[in-house]
Swiss-Prot record:
Residues the record marks as active site: C103 (nucleophile), C199 (cysteine persulfide intermediate)
InterPro entries (alphabetical): MnmA-like, MnmA-like_C, MnmA-like_central, MnmA-like_central_sf, Rossmann-like_a/b/a_fold
Disulfide cysteine pairs (residue numbers): C103-C199
Annotated family: Belongs to the MnmA/TRMU family.
Site (described: Interaction with tRNA): H128, Q338
Organism of this sequence: Clostridium kluyveri (strain ATCC 8527 / DSM 555 / NBRC 12016 / NCIMB 10680 / K1)
Pfam families, sorted: tRNA_Me_trans (PF03054), tRNA_Me_trans_C (PF20258), tRNA_Me_trans_M (PF20259)
Keyword Disulfide bond part of the UniProt annotation: yes
HAMAP family to which the protein is assigned, alphabetical: tRNA_thiouridyl_MnmA
Domain of life: Bacteria
Enzyme Commission number(s) from the entry: 2.8.1.13
Entry protein name: tRNA-specific 2-thiouridylase MnmA
Length: 356
């Protein structure tokens, strides 16, 4: 009997081709589009993104073309609790969260996996650019063939159980190859642009979104320098992130950057670019893939944000919940709330949340 797999279909080219590839490999494929948007009226005008209403229609059309069943499932409550509420709270605390990482851990590879198993499926699959591998009885992830599209950074916190029940067929292809496959099999989404914005914030203005959702909780405060001198007024700490230069609304005659955010006093500290370069960080909520615990210092390549290049570093254990990361070269804007992720020979070692 063929193994059954539920493919999370966003209506984009990657998940559409993932469904096709798995069907070609002999799996019994079921397409599921996750309904996560919170306010139907607010999203009616969205033209793209995995939360848009048009994405549902695109996914349905692809499923029909591939001759596979397709369902739309409601994940609103879980998405609000684990992604949106977390996103807002982190910004209110002066941090810079990554909602895609939270969505992967709690929605796509947890809630969707549970629904998939309720349908009798053996696996859940996505269009992520990564490859699941089993090395020495442990599941881990290998970087995608297309390093420009590699998405392993956002998948470091998956559990062994989740990885054991996950398929990512796009990881062995380059993006242009995925688009070519879509063209060859007649999928209308072959030229659909990639979604780059935060899916639940269509205009990408996270500050305005948080202010609208939290109503009167976002307050104006002071910009200060390192000595505590007041430099001017800011719109609210949720509008700013470490290393930010644009959108400060002030002119000092020299390049000025956000070098710290103080949520308890509602202050944003400004300084020079030199002030945001550091070599050390501490990470919490750490998850390792090839092994359970770090038992001795380890040389790795580490990324402090999705778009950054991997940099040489040494990781060592501080206690049961935290690790220290020491980079060989100084890194720009190591930001609380973002994830630091580790690699060795293109294998994902693990990662954690930057705490200090």
């Amino acid at each position: 009997m063929a193994k059954k797999v539920v493919v999370g279909m966003s209506g984009g080219v990657d998940s559409s081709v993932a469904a096709h590839l798995l069907k070609e490999q002999g799996y019994e494929v079921i397409g599921v589009t996750m309904q996560v948007w919170q306010e139907d009226d607010y999203y009616e005008d969205m033209e793209s993104g995995c939360c848009s209403l048009s994405a549902v229609e695109d996914a349905k059309m692809v499923a029909y073309h591939l001759n596979i069943p397709h369902y739309v499932m409601n994940f609103k409550e879980a998405f609000k609790k684990n992604v949106i509420d977390y996103f807002i709270q982190e910004y209110m605390e002066g941090k810079t969260p990554n909602p895609c990482i939270a969505c992967n851990k709690y929605i796509k590879f947890d809630e969707l996996l549970k629904r998939a198993m309720d349908l009798g499926a053996d696996y859940v699959a996505t269009g992520h650019y990564a490859t699941v591998e089993k090395i020495n009885d442990r599941y881990t992830l290998r970087k995608s063939k297309d390093h420009n599209k590699d998405q392993t950074y956002a998948l470091y916190n998956l559990t062994q159980f989740q990885l054991a029940h996950t398929l990512m067929p796009c990881g062995i292809y380059k993006k242009e190859e995925i688009r070519e496959i879509a063209r060859e099999i007649g999928l209308m989404v072959h030229s659909k642009r990639d979604s780059e914005e935060i899916c639940f914030i269509p205009d990408n203005d996270h500050g305005a979104y948080i202010k609208r959702i939290t109503k009167d909780k976002v307050k104006e405060g002071n910009f200060i320098d390192k000595e505590g001198n007041v430099l001017g007024k800011h719109k609210g700490i949720v509008y700013y992130t470490l290393g930010q230069r644009k959108g400060l609304g002030l002119s000092f005659g020299v390049p000025t950057y956000v070098i710290d955010i103080k949520p308890y006093t509602n202050e944003v500290v400004l300084g020079s670019e030199e002030d945001i370069f550091k070599t050390d960080l501490v990470a919490k909520d750490v998850n390792f893939l090839p092994f359970e615990n770090l038992t001795s210092p380890m040389k790795v390549e580490a990324k402090i944000r999705y778009s950054s290049k991997p940099a040489e570093a040494t990781i060592s254990c501080l206690d049961e919940e935290r690790i220290k990361v020491k980079f060989t070269d100084r890194q720009r804007a190591i930001t609380k709330g973002q994830s630091v992720v580790f690699y060795k020979d293109n294998i994902l070692i693990g990662g954690g949340i930057i705490d200090s």
